[in-house]
């Protein structure tokens, strides 16, 4: 008998464990109070978290080690676990099953009974009954006492009492399937990445619990497994995967038996200049920290002070350190378990339980100081980093003082390049940050000077991810930007009230250079002015890369992808693709095929740097870009593929391609003007990231390209053999009667064009910059802009499928 089964048999978790605090109608009247914002998606996803949290509470109690979350095709969600199963007996006070009580009564559940759960997420979430209240329908299945039970609800109202649907079932657990209310939520489409982030978080925090996330909504099923045995130490390493750690991880575990409060802490310093501290109470993230965070900070400062004094290193310090200096480059996950946690609001973003503070502070001080004394070499590296931070802070202070003295002597302290607007009200004022004087000149001519200011930045923009604060202040471009915004910079000086524009718009060219400059500016704002992002003041302009003209009509297109889409759609409207002289694809069906063909061709372009493009394509569409090519059963298909390849590449100077099979490689060869041309395909190449993805995508169009294809566009007929030929033919047909102009930069547009496409508030498109998950954003900026190469390579590989056209 397993540990979980023994606990299940011993459990006293029954109907009498359920305590009731009544009322459910209020949830439907004011859903935002109970589930979060019903308009921005946070409340919608919290519906899943409420059900998952119940399963995790079972795991915390030691009764569950598997949780499944499935996004179903019909838009519903299923959450299941292998815990004890919700109690099914009749509740003495209510006269209905305990399961129905839990689902229909507010504040009903085992969390109110200390014998059922020692710790849980607290009372502010108010439980799964809220999910029921805010669902069009909900279905609850319970496996308990070798019996399967079922109960259904419509808009929170019970259809029929809990019923037994199957007996003699060797299974335990709970399964909840719900469809969110279309009347309550503005949008009921779940975001896979948001759910993935939260479930990964929970898997790290609950070592040994396996969480499976499956998305069945699309043709290609997506499944991710989260299972970590390293706990929060593994979490810290995951968060810091794009940085160099200064030392091995410090791990602190502490239990206070009197209060029932326990602490798990993992942290290390890295070579960056930014702190990243994640705080959790009973698995729930506190974005605004609280008593556990303030306790950690004060405890850590005490540790550094004591260690410096004990070792005499304080005498070597040029400058006194601050609390911020001690946390420069720190990555920390702090998780506390509290029997009765108190939060500042229902969103649980800040812990206010005062009893947590002394326990956390004392544990941090005692255990971390002990670690320092046991690891003197690592401690010295940490102390050196803190002293460097203190010195840099002092240098930055002197640089700011010098800047202030200069500004006092100037008539105006606004930068000379800034073409300011006439409006003095920040709420209506806009600042466009543009690259170079050329684009700046055009923008100044085309703008509405009443409300639009233009700031051209000339020269190389500093990558602040790799620069200390004092070096950043020495950058002309960054200094100009800080002065123009008026807020100051860093925690001591920054004031959002002094911001001169409530729309700060990054406007760069629509090419790869513009993207790089935009990323550098986004890095600066994220690292040093995150308040602008949090308040929704930062935007990205969407200038066009192309202008297409057809007859008298003109259209501006944002990028290469938009141009290709336009040309393809132009041709598709008059196109028919016939398969084996029978089935015909037109309009939506042809458009769906072309979207796959475009993606397929993009992957081929990437892979062509490693192997011949034509051979790769012909093998892929014959399902041979895999280990099947080595099987004798595939010889006939390989011969057919070679015949197709040779018909495409006929040349009087070249012989046909031939093939030789070896144990771990395939050799393709032909003679060109007497010289042998060889292409070697290794078995290990077939197992590479690029080829696996090409092969997967090829299977989705296999049925089409295994037939004889004829394309007709406006009475013109074309024989089609491969996806590349289909795409190129469609694009060429789409170009007929159309002139295309490519803008190399914003400076190539005249002022009227720039106004019409990018500046005019009535016509333009702006992208507002938002941060959904801070630690995910932290990881992305560290990966893309940091010093470590390997995580960046992995990021590019894993996201290559999402790139259709790469402008290089």
From Swiss-Prot:
Q: What job does this protein perform?
A: A type II topoisomerase that negatively supercoils closed circular double-stranded (ds) DNA in an ATP-dependent manner to modulate DNA topology and maintain chromosomes in an underwound state. Negative supercoiling favors strand separation, and DNA replication, transcription, recombination and repair, all of which involve strand separation. Also able to catalyze the interconversion of other topological isomers of dsDNA rings, including catenanes and knotted rings. Type II topoisomerases break and join 2 DNA strands simultaneously in an ATP-dependent manner.
Co-factor: note? Binds two Mg(2+) per subunit. The magnesium ions form salt bridges with both the protein and the DNA. Can also accept other divalent metal cations, such as Mn(2+) or Ca(2+).
* GO terms (BP aspect): DNA topological change; DNA-templated DNA replication
Q: Where is this site: Interaction with DNA?
A: 460, 463
* Name by which UniProt lists this protein: DNA gyrase subunit B
NCBIfam families linked to this entry: gyrB, PRK05644.1, PRK14939.1
Q: Which cofactors is this protein said to need?
A: Mg(2+); Mn(2+); Ca(2+)
InterPro entries found in the cross-reference section: DNA_gyrase_B_C, GyrB, GyrB_hook, HATPase_C_sf, Ribosomal_Su5_D2-typ_SF, Ribsml_uS5_D2-typ_fold_subgr, Topo_IIA, Topo_IIA-like_dom_sf
Q: Where in the cell is it found?
A: Cytoplasm
The organism named in the record is Rickettsia bellii (strain RML369-C)
UniProt keyword list: ATP-binding, Cytoplasm, DNA-binding, Isomerase, Magnesium, Metal-binding, Nucleotide-binding, Topoisomerase
EC main class here is isomerase
Cite the binding residues for Mg(2+) 1. 435, 509
Q: What is its EC number?
A: 5.6.2.2
Q: Which reaction does it catalyse?
A: ATP-dependent breakage, passage and rejoining of double-stranded DNA
Where's the Toprim domain? Answer: 429-544
Q: Which CDD domains match?
A: HATPase_GyrB-like, TopoII_Trans_DNA_gyrase, TOPRIM_TopoIIA_GyrB
Q: Which residues bind Mg(2+) 2?
A: 509, 511
Provide the primary localization: cytoplasm
**Single Gene Ontology MF annotation:** metal ion binding
Similarity remark: Belongs to the type II topoisomerase GyrB family.
Record bears the keyword Protein biosynthesis: no
Could you describe the subunit structure of this protein?
A: Heterotetramer, composed of two GyrA and two GyrB chains. In the heterotetramer, GyrA contains the active site tyrosine that forms a transient covalent intermediate with DNA, while GyrB binds cofactors and catalyzes ATP hydrolysis.
């Amino acid at each position: 008998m397993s540990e979980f089964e023994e606990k299940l048999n011993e459990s006293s978790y029954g109907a009498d464990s359920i305590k009731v605090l009544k009322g459910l109608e209020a949830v439907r009247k004011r859903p935002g109070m109970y589930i979060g914002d019903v308009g921005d998606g946070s409340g919608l996803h919290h519906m899943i978290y409420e059900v998952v949290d119940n399963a995790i509470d079972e795991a915390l109690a030691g009764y569950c080690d598997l949780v499944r979350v499935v996004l179903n095709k019909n838009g519903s969600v299923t959450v299941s676990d292998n815990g004890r199963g919700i109690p099914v007996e009749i509740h003495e006070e209510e006269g209905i099953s305990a399961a129905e009580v839990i689902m229909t009564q507010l504040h009903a559940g085992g969390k109110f009974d200390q014998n059922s759960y020692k710790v849980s997420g607290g009372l502010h979430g108010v439980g799964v009954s809220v999910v029921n209240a805010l669902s069009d329908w909900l279905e609850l299945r319970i496996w308990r006492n070798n019996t399967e039970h079922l109960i259904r609800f419509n808009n929170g109202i019970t259809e029929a009492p809990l019923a037994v649907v199957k007996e003699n079932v060797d299974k335990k657990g709970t399964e909840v399937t719900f469809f969110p209310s279309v009347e309550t939520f503005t949008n009921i489409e779940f975001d896979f990445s948001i759910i993935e982030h939260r479930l990964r978080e929970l898997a790290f925090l609950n070592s040994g619990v396996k969480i499976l996330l499956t998305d069945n909504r699309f043709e290609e099923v997506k499944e991710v497994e989260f299972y970590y045995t390293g706990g929060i130490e593994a979490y810290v390493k995951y968060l810091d995967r794009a940085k160099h750690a200064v030392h091995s991880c410090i791990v602190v575990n502490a239990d206070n038996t009197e209060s029932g409060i326990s602490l798990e802490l993992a942290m290390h310093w890295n070579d960056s200049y930014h702190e990243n501290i994640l705080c959790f109470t009973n698995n729930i993230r506190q974005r605004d920290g609280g008593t556990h965070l303030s306790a950690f900070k004060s405890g850590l400062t005490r540790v550094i002070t004591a260690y410096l004094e004990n070792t005499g290193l304080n005498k070597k310090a040029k400058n006194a350190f601050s609390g911020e200096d001690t946390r420069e480059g720190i990555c920390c996950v702090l998780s506390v378990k509290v029997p009765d946690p108190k939060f500042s609001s229902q969103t649980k973003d800040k812990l206010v339980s005062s009893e947590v503070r002394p326990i956390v502070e004392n544990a941090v001080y005692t255990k971390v100081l002990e670690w320092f004394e046991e690891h003197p070499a690592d401690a010295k590296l940490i102390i050196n980093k803190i002293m460097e931070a203190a010195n840099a802070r002092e240098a930055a202070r002197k640089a700011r003082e010098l800047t202030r003295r200069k500004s006092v002597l100037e008539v105006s302290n606004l930068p000379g390049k800034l073409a300011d607007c006439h409006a003095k009200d920040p709420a209506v004022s806009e600042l466009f940050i543009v690259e170079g004087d050329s684009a700046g000149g055009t923008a100044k001519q085309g703008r509405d000077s009443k409300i639009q200011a233009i700031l051209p930045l000339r020269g190389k923009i500093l990558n602040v991810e790799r620069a200390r604060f004092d070096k950043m202040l020495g950058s002309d471009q960054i200094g100009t930007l800080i002065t123009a915004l008026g807020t100051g910079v860093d925690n001591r000086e920054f004031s959002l009230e002094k911001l001169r524009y409530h729309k700060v718009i990054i406007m760069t060219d629509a090419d790869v250079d513009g993207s790089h400059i935009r990323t550098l500016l986004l890095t600066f704002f994220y690292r040093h002015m995150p308040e602008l992002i949090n308040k929704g003041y930062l935007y990205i302009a969407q200038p066009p890369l192309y202008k297409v003209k057809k007859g008298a009509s003109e259209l501006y297109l944002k990028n290469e992808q938009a141009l290709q889409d336009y040309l393809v759609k132009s041709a598709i409207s008059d196109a028919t693709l016939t398969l084996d002289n029978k089935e015909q694809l037109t309009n939506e069906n042809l458009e769906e095929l072309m979207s796959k063909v475009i993606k397929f061709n993009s992957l081929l372009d990437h892979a062509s740097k490693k192997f011949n493009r034509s051979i790769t394509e012909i093998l892929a569409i014959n399902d041979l870009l895999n280990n099947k090519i080595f099987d004798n059963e595939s010889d006939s298909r390989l011969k057919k593929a070679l015949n197709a390849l040779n018909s495409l590449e006929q040349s009087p100077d070249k012989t046909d391609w031939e093939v030789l099979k070896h144990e771990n490689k395939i050799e393709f060869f032909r003679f060109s003007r007497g010289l042998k041309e060889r292409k070697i395909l290794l078995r290990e190449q077939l197992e590479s990231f690029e080829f696996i993805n090409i092969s997967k995508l090829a299977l989705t169009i296999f049925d089409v390209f295994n037939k004889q294809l004829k394309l007709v566009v406006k009475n013109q007929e074309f024989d089609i053999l491969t996806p590349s030929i289909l795409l190129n033919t469609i694009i060429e047909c789409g170009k007929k009667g159309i002139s295309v102009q490519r803008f190399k930069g914003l400076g190539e547009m005249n002022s009227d064009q720039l106004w019409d496409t990018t500046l005019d508030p009535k016509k333009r498109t702006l992208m507002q910059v938002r941060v959904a998950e801070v630690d995910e954003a932290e990881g992305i900026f560290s990966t893309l802009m940091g010093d470590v190469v390997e995580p960046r390579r992995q990021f590019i590989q894993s996201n290559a499928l999402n790139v259709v056209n790469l402008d290089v």
